[in-house]
Each structure stands twice: as structure tokens, then as C-alpha cells.
Amino acid sequence: MSQQVFSAHPALAVDQLQQAEQEEHNTSSNHHQQRSATQSRRHTKAAPKKFTLSRSCAGGGSGTLSGVHQQVKPSPSNPAISPECRKTLPVRTNYAAVDDDDDIECEDVDEVNFGQQEKERERETRQPTKDCGTDETDHVQQRHKNTMTTSATAASRHHHQDGGGGDQSDLSSVISSPSVSTVSSPLSTPTRLPQALQQQLHCCQKSTGMESRARTSPQQIQHPHRQHHQQQHHHHHHHHHLTAAGCTGGGGGGGGSGGSGSCKAKKLDPRLNPSPYRQLLPIALCLLSFAAVFATLIVYMDTTEIRHQQFRLNMSRDYELNGVAQDDPALIDFLRQIHMGKYLGKASPKVAAAASVGVGPPPNSPRLAAAGSTFGSGNSSGSGADQLAHYVADLVGGKMNGAVIQSLSGPLAHLITAPWLSEQLNWMGVLVEPEPRWYFTLRKQNAQRARMQVVHACVSPNTYPKEITIHNEDVRINSLHDEETSWFNSRVKCFPLYTIMLACERTEYDLLSLGVQGHELEILQTLPFDKVKIDVISIHLLEDHEDVADYVLDITRFLAGKSYKLQRKIGRNYFYQRLNASASRTRKKDILLLKTP
């Protein structure tokens, strides 16, 4: 079956309609002709000639004027049309063919399309209701389906009411036809749009068939359907605009451009946008990350502050190891290896050889005699340490290869006599210095003396070791917390005096000098005098020491109980000598005098 196209001009449309009716009457049966004649006589009504022609045109070409594809047999005047070109634009109705003065009613229109019901059903089976080849949004397709269902229901209801007769003339197409600017002129000829533009309007073209059937329904159904069609056309506007832009810009690739336009339409769909919770997800993650980092910093700062407070507490607290005895072998090894072993000075080869041989100046050497005469005469030309050293040498009778142990800290460090005794009498000396600055000074001064040992420690006033903080008032550093200066405090380990003697592997000493700022008596009380042997004990007090007389009296009483006697006082330096040693030395001198002639 070919598609017949009618002109919009009434005269031409009448001629074409008459030719189509003749061919149709020749091929149809007599039964159809009788029924058509009966129905035409039944609906005959007096009307003007002009309106009759228009009515005949409208009745005969109702299928084509309403925008649907009328299928008729091919004829010489109306050649057959290929299947590819079946989609055409709806033929425009000429408003000039209708007389506005005449009163037109739908009941007066002759039914000239009798017998077209079977053809319309056959066309509906061949032509799909909706072409979904082009992507559209879901809500547009759903609205189109609802419209088609409503139109089909209204059309079927109208056919049942008419009893299977033909359709009425398409009067509704005249009422809802396009604007005057789109109406063709009387001399216009039917034209066909290009294939690209036919694809743009496929949605509206395929829906015109259903709309034409819906217009044949009663007027109470026709008006709501027309409003719904206008809304549908408004919703399709954006889709047609994107499709037209794709076809115009892409040419042959109109399908791909239409696909990109549909993708843009999907992006504009509010249902496809991310939910509010998903949009807030990056912000929530950012806040959580910031909170985690901030919490980590707070924990780190608190931990650092706690550690710093613990460190300051450790630096200010004294630890007493009262469970460790002063003659513990582990304690002695610790003191010997840690505090004494790595601080041994390297003497020159000559000094080391002399120390190993034990050679020193003779007792009656002129140098020693000069030193003794100088000290005895009270000449103050020498230093205080040299004067004290000469007096000690006089007390011991100029003994060679003796031993001295001294602990004079702070302001009393200038009274140390061990270096002089080591050089003049080849004595072995042990210097105990707790303050770091004076310790490094003494170590530098005695670096070339092989028999001098400097120990970085303090003498404990108890019989067990301990660790204390030394407050050095003459050393200042910048504070780490504020701009003010703070006193530098150092930590030092204190060992009992007897432990230091055992670490030096010697318990017999010729001289013991103590100047520890008021702790001399406590240190002397820790010594086991039954296990050690000390000839001379010197006590050195500070000038600002309070109650010097009472303190010296207490020391004198304690040493008197240990067989020591105060021999001489030089300033605030007190010298005590063991009585047994002095008596034995006097006895030796008397024996020598008796043997001489």
C-alpha cells in the first residue's frame, strides 16, 4: 500500500479525493457501496455549496488532514511512495475554505470514511505507538505512555458507541491547527522534509495518529486531552532542541550528537544528581581529618609535657640507694670502670718511668729544706696551697711515695695540695670533684701526672650511694621556657669515702683533706677506722660558715675518740694527726740519737 498525499488547497484536495474514491469504489465490494449510500442518505442535510465542498474535503481526507498516514492504492496521478519516506509532516488546513458565518456542528458532518476502521487497525499494528530510539528522560516516556493509553481508550469507546461505523470529519484539527504563519498558501504543493529533520520530529509525528483518534471523541474528552497534549509538547521542547543542535552540527553523525545531547539532558535531571548526604560527604571527611590531626597534636603535646615534667622531677629529686653496702663489689666495679677507668691521664714517658721506679727527691734535699724553712718562717710569698703542702710534708717527716685523697669542691678548690705533693714527694693522689667545670679544669691540669686520678663524683655523707642535684650558682644558661635566666643544675652520683678507697685499691693514706661545705663530720662518721689507716686529716671550712667554733669542737671530739689530735690551725684549715703515728715517729728519732756517738 502506498501513501497518498493531499494538497491543502480545497479545489485540488477535492479532485484528489474524488480520484481516490473512484479507485476505492472500483476495488471495493457492492456491499460496502450499499452501506455507504445508506449512511450518506441518512445524514444528508441542506447546506451551502461552498460548505459542502469543504465538508467533502474534510470528510474524505480526514486521515491525512489530521496528520496520520492514509494508506490507499497507487494510481497514475498519485504514485506510490517508498517505505523510507512514509513519515511526513501533517498537512495544514486552509482556514480560507471554511465559512465562519456558517454554524458547524459535528453531527452534520457526513461520514465519508466508511470502511476505514479495518485500515486504521492494520496501520496501528504496523506502526509502533512510540519510538524510543532516541534517549529521553524517564518522566517524559512515562507521560507519553499515559497519553497513548488515554487516547486509545477514548477512541475505542467512541467506536463502540457508533457501532463500528466510520470516523467523523476532522473538525478538531481545524480548531487546534497551527498558527496562521504555518498555514500553506492556496498555490502550495505538498513537500517532504529531509530525512535528518524527519528524525528530529519523530516523537510528535508518531503521536499525531493517536491524537487524531482522540479528537474524534466527544467534546467533553477532547478539551482536557488538548491541554495535556500542549503540556507534553512543552516538555518535549528541550529534547527536540538538543536533537536539532546535534543534527545541524554533526551532519551525517546526527545519531552520535543526539546521544551526547541526551547525556546532557540526563545530567540536568535532578533525580540523577547526588543526594545531599553524598554532597556533604567531602566536607564531613575534611572535618574528621582535621579533628584527627588536631587530636593527635594535642595528645603529642600532652605527652611531651608529661615527659618534660618527669624529667624535671628526676633532675630535682635525690635517689638514695640505701640497700647497697659501701663495700659491695658491684658498686666498686661500677665506680672503677665508669667513673675512674676512662678518666686516667696519659703522662709523658719520663714521668711514667720515674713513677714506675719510684725515684724522688731525697728527704734532706735542699729543695725540701728550703720549702720547710720558708713555711716555718711564716713567709707569705708562696700560695696558700704550697704553704699547706709544706706543713703536711713537715708533719709526715718528708715521707716519699705517700698517698693523698682530697675532696675540696667549689671555692675551696684552690687549697688542693695533691699536685705539689705528687711532684715533690712522688705521692699518689685521688681528687674527687663533683662540679663539672672544676672537674674538667683539674683533669686538664693533671693530665701529665701519671699518679694523679680525678674522679667526677661526690663523697656521700651516708654509708650508701646516692644521686643528687648540684646547684651551681656561678653558671647560668638561657632558659628554654622564658627569656629569664635560670640556674644550671647538674646531676652527680655520690659514693661513700670507703668505697672510693677500695676502688683505688688502697686503704692506707698519709693525708685526707675534706672541704665539702659542712658535711665533713658526717663523712668522717661513715669511715670504718678499724679498716683504714690515715695519718693526717685536714678540715677546710668556708669563711661564711656559721658556728665555726661549735662545729670544729664537734669534729675535734669525734676525732679524739679515734686517737686524733688537733695539731695546728691555719686560718680556717684544721690539721689533725693520729697519736700513735707521732709517738712511734718520736721513738725512732730517740733511737737514732742514742746510736750516734
Curated annotation (Swiss-Prot):
UniProt-listed InterPro entries: EGF_Rcpt_Signaling_Reg, FkbM_mtfrase, SAM-dependent_MTases_sf
Tissue/organ expression: In the larval eye disk, expression is first seen at the morphogenetic furrow, then in the developing R2, R5, and R8 cells as well as in the posterior clusters of the disk in additional R cells.
Topology in the lipid bilayer: Single-pass type II membrane protein
Cytoplasmic side: 1-279
Residue ranges, Lumenal side: 301-597
Compositional bias of kind Low complexity: 168-193
Coiled-coil portions: none
Segments passing through the bilayer: 280-300
Gene3D superfamilies: Vaccinia Virus protein VP39 (3.40.50.150)
Pfam families: Methyltransf_21
Biased composition (Gly residues): 247-261
Bias type Basic and acidic residues, positions: 117-141
Record's keyword terms, sorted: Cell membrane, Developmental protein, Endoplasmic reticulum, Golgi apparatus, Membrane, Sensory transduction, Signal-anchor, Transmembrane, Transmembrane helix, Vision
Described purpose of this protein according to its UniProt entry: Involved in EGF receptor signaling. Has an early role in photoreceptor development. Interacts with the receptor torpedo in the eye.
Protein name as it appears in the record: Protein Star
Record organism: Drosophila melanogaster
Organism classification: Eukaryota, Metazoa, Ecdysozoa, Arthropoda, Hexapoda
Gene: S
